[in-house]
Amino acid sequence: MSGHEHYNENYVLADNLYEHVHAPLSTLFWQAPWACDGTPGGYAVYEFDGGKVNWYYKCVGKDKDYQFELYPVGASRNKKEAVVANVWNYDSTWKVKWYENGIDKGEMTRFSGYDPAIYEYCEKNSSTFKHKYLGADITEHLFYAVPETKDSEIRVEVTDHCGNVYTRKMQQSK
């Protein structure tokens, strides 16, 4: 486990070697509700059962099932034509699928970019930050998909390393 960073990243280095880089509870030095990669303030929870270890990221004030954020078309400066999911505890064993109007569209495409919420927050509030060098940073745990219609219902299902499935829905508007 690594901790002295202001973002969340996970690496599967071998079958028995995994590196967790934890975003801090203090997010962006207490200047924003998210870390620079859009990870909400929170902490890692590890559950041990004999030789088995499970883990998840617990966002402060949110249910354990809140494991990603879903943004509508137009929210992301990097992918304006797409819905975007920020899956902050993602690693290469996770699956990020999407559905449009109930039809399975397959896996979303991973990309590097800015989380829309922290980017917008920093644009509006950085002049009040105690440390002027703080801001949004590019992250690799973003996923996108381009809907076929503008008024479709979008559902995203994220399956973690333990097989837990997390779901978010949104209704697109014209």
Language-model regions, residue ranges each:
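Long, low-complexity serine/threonine/glycine- and acidic-rich segments characteristic of extracellular
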Residues: L70-K174
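Conserved beta-sheet core of the metallophosphoesterase superfamily
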Residues: M1-G74, D104-G106, E123-K124
